[in-house]
């Protein structure tokens, strides 16, 4: 893996701490804007251990096991041991997940197809690039050694990496090849 790159899986379940350095939960997912070039993280899904408030709203009773989507502007720092938020619990700004692309939910392990609907393979890993506190989508990692179609996939990935002038790992499809993410499949430009 190239310097500055990391896998989505390495961030999932990472501890999340508020502005007072209290553990409030863990990272559950990341929302990305695929229209941006390169695609950038827009929101962070945090699995809270418990809360009696959502933003400024007081709940009728405390709840456990709730996932809130917070805008990326809430992220103060990304450290190896934790994600640090700008505000203290429970004073977070909250976003709706409606219309958002969440990498864990919508991309990881999703079936990839070409524009004609031919099945290619599943997404094995999502590769991100970190620049300061920002995260960008680099590409989609695919395994090529376990499947009979491995050589065909290897040729396809090589072709895509040359098309988008991307050096690096031979088994990573560049983000530029992603056409769209549908409910049932991720469409790749071949």
Model-derived features: positions:
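Peripheral interaction segments used for macromolecular assembly
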Residues: 1-190
């Amino acid at each position: 893996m190239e310097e500055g790159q990391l896998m989505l899986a390495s961030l999932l379940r990472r501890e999340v701490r508020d502005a007072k350095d209290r553990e409030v939960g863990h990272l559950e997912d990341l929302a990305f804007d695929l229209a941006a070039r390169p695609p950038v993280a827009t929101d962070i899904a945090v699995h809270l251990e418990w809360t009696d408030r959502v933003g400024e709203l007081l709940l009728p009773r405390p709840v456990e096991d709730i996932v809130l989507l917070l805008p990326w502007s809430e992220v103060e720092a990304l450290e190896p041991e934790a994600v640090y938020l700008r505000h203290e619990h429970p004073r977070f700004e909250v976003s709706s997940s409606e219309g958002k692309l969440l990498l864990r939910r919508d991309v990881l392990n999703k079936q990839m197809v070409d524009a004609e609907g031919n099945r290619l393979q599943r997404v094995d890993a999502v590769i991100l690039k970190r620049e300061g506190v920002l995260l960008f989508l680099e590409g989609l990692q695919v395994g090529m050694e376990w499947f009979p179609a491995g050589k065909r996939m290897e040729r396809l990935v090589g072709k895509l990496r040359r098309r988008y002038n991307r050096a690096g790992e031979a088994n990573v499809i560049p983000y530029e090849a992603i056409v769209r993410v549908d409910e049932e499949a991720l469409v790749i430009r071949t």
